[in-house]
Amino acid sequence: MWAFRTARIGSLLAATSVILRRCLRLGVAMAKSKFEYVRNFEVQDTCLPHCWVVVRLDGRNFHRFAEEHNFAKPNDSRALHLMTKCAQTVMEELEDIVIAYGQSDEYSFVFRKKSNWFKRRASKFMTLVASQFASSYVFYWRDYFEDQPLRYPPGFDGRVVLYPSNQTLKDYLSWRQADCHINNLYNTVFWALIQQSGLTPVQAQQRLKGTLTADKNEILFSEFHINYNNEPHMYRKGTVLVWQKVEEVRTQEVRLPAEMEGEKKAVARTRTRVVALNCDLIGDAFWKEHPEILAEEN
Ligand SMILES: Nc1nc2c(ncn2[C@@H]2O[C@H](COP(=O)(O)OP(=O)(O)OP(=O)(O)O)[C@@H](O)[C@H]2O)c(=O)[nH]1
Ligand SMILES: [Mg+2]
Ligand SMILES: [Mg+2]
C-alpha cells in the first residue's frame, strides 16, 4: 500500500515537472521574437581591465560658439567657470571618476582602474559623460552668462582612451596641461598685439611665426609690461578637479528642553566634495600631495 502511494506521488511529480518545463520553454520561446537575432549585431566595447579609462570631451566648433556668444579674448572666465561647473556635476552624478582636468573647451575625466560601472562599456562611459556635461552646460548657462542669451545648443564630442599604467596616465594629463600652456602663451601675445598694438590677425600671426617661448615672454614683457608668470593660474594651468574632505559648518536647529526650543547651534561635519585647483600636474608635487588618486585600490 505504502509503496503504491509513493509510486503514485512520484509519477504525479514527474508529470508536473514535464508540464512545468514545457510551460517554461513556451514562455521563453514566446518572450523571444524572431527579431531577437539583431542583438548579435551589437559590438562588444568593454574597456580592457586594470587600465585607467579616460573620457575626453571637446566643444564642437567652439571657435564659432565663442564668437557668437561674445567670449572675452583670449580667455573668458565665465566660460571657463561654466565648464568647471559642468565637470563638477559630471563627477558628482556619475560614478568612479577620481580626477578631471579641463582647459579651453575640453575636459578629461579619469575613471578608476577597477571601475566596473556599466560593465566597463566604453559607449556607456562616453555617452553618459557627454550628455550629462552638455545638459549641465545649458542648465547652468544663465548662472555664468547673466546678460548673454544662449543663442543655439552647444555640442561636445567624446572619446575614450585607455592608459595601462600610472605613468602613462600622468603623461596624458601632463600632455593636456602642456597644451594649455602653449596655446595660452600664444593666445596672450597674439591678442595683445591685436588689442593693444592694433595689428591685424594676419600681421600678429606673421609676427609670431617661428618664435620660441622665450621670445613670446620677451614681447609680452617689453611691449606690454606683462609678466606671463603673473597671469591668472586658471588661464596658464587649466583646472584640476579632485575629491577632497571638506569641513562644513552649518547652523542647525537642535532638540532641547521646551524652554530653549528653536535654538540653533553650529554643527561641523566632514564631507567629500569635488574641489577645483589651478595647480601644476606635470611635476611630482601634485602626485605626492594626492597619493590617493593613484593608490592601488583604484
Ligand atoms: N574667445 C575665447 N574663445 C575660446 C575660449 N575658450 C575656447 N575658445 C574657442 O574655442 C576654440 C577651441 O579650439 P578647438 O577645440 O581646437 O576648435 P573648435 O573650434 O572647438 O573645433 P572642433 O573642436 O574641431 O569642433 C578655440 O580655438 C577658441 O576659438 C575663451 O575663453 N575665449
Ligand atoms: Mg573644440
Ligand atoms: Mg578644444
From Swiss-Prot:
Cystine links in this protein are none
Which residues take part in binding Mg(2+) 2?
A: 58, 105
Query: What GO CC annotations are associated with the protein?
Result: mitochondrion; transferase complex
Name the UniProt key words of this record, in alphabetical order.
Answer: Cytoplasm, GTP-binding, Magnesium, Metal-binding, Mitochondrion, Nucleotide-binding, Nucleotidyltransferase, Transferase, tRNA processing
Q: Which GO terms describe its molecular function?
A: ATP binding; GTP binding; guanyl-nucleotide exchange factor activity; identical protein binding; magnesium ion binding; tRNA guanylyltransferase activity
The cofactor binding remark recorded in the entry reads: Binds 2 magnesium ions per subunit.
Provide the E.C. number(s) assigned to this enzyme.
2.7.7.79
Q: What class of enzyme is it?
A: transferase
Q: Which family does it belong to?
A: Belongs to the tRNA(His) guanylyltransferase family.
**Would you tell me the protein name for this molecule?**
Probable tRNA(His) guanylyltransferase
Q: Which gene encodes it?
A: Thg1l
